[in-house]
């Protein structure tokens, strides 16, 4: 199976052939996947070199001319390093585009903290009007990328990861998918967290919602997952980025119902002995065994 990044390159290359409004902007990273596309469309596959602020500025400039830029590099460079340009060149200028990240929170532990961005979703969430997709499988990544490329002048962030679920689920570019039903609580699994969540809650009487679009937050699906007649609700959010990123959104969705929310994800404390991805996940308490202990302790 190809990776999400490989699927991004092949999908974006196909879209360049069919939509003259699209352009791909790169900052050295990912250029190999676009070699053929750059030869076919030298004016619409642009590599600015290792200049991430210029990467965003170029995308924003293209958007001002009426084009639809697909802007790509590691999340730590795309969002963290170039945040001021994202805020101004897309938000303040009122333009739209698609930011496509790789690396995520801990995809390359050996690369160190410079190549990790556990706070990307939370940071973008301080800005207005961004749709944010977190696919959990290459097929989902392709569907969401195609949706984002065709989304008029909207501002869209697509967060790719090396971690994937075993099978793709239907995605529409909005709304949570109900995967299983229960009565003791609701667990929202974001993107590549789904398989670990399902393994963790096996045998527990809980509902599981699958989120591949996290902004806008799907208030309606969360409320619908609460059993009819319930006077209280317990919700667990399992996100592959900063723990608690969506806690406020869940609280707002359930504002008129007494409830508790547990936000699980990447902690603020930096893990400095990185190891492998699996070791890093375990160190963060996001492996199935740790998730089960934390969920059952919360539900009592």
Spell out what each predicted region is:
Residues 1-153, 161-300:
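Thiamine diphosphate
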């Amino acid at each position: 199976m190809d990776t999400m990044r490989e699927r991004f390159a092949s999908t974006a290359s196909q879209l360049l052939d069919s939509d003259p409004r699209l352009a791909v902007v790169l900052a050295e990273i990912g250029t190999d996947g676009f070699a053929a596309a750059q030869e076919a469309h030298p004016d619409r596959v642009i590599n600015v070199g290792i200049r991430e602020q210029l990467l965003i500025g170029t995308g924003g400039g293209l958007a001002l001319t009426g084009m639809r830029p697909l802007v790509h590099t590691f999340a730590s460079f795309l969002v963290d390093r170039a945040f001021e340009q994202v805020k101004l060149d897309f938000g303040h200028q009122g333009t739209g585009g698609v930011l496509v990240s790789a690396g995520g929170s801990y995809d390359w532990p050996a690369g160190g903290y410079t190549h990790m961005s556990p706070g990307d979703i939370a940071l973008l969430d301080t800005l207005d009007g961004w749709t944010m997709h977190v696919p959990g499988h290459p097929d989902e990544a392709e569907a969401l990328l195609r949706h984002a490329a065709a989304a008029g002048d909207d501002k869209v962030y697509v967060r790719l990861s090396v971690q994937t679920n075993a099978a793709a689920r239907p995605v529409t570019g909005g709304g949570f998918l109900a995967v299983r039903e229960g009565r003791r609580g609701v667990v929202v699994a974001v993107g590549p967290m789904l398989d670990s969540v399902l393994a963790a809650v096996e045998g527990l009487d809980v509902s599981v919602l699958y989120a591949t679009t996290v902004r806008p937050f799907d208030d309606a699906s969360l409320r619908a997952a609460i059993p009819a007649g319930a006077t209280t609700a317990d919700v667990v959010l399992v996100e592959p980025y900063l723990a608690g990123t969506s806690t406020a959104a869940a609280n707002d969705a359930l504002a008129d119902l007494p409830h508790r929310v547990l936000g699980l994800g990447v902690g603020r404390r930096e893990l400095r002995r990185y190891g492998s991805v699996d070791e890093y996940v375990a160190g963060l308490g996001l492996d199935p065994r740790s998730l089960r202990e934390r969920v059952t302790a919360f539900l009592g």
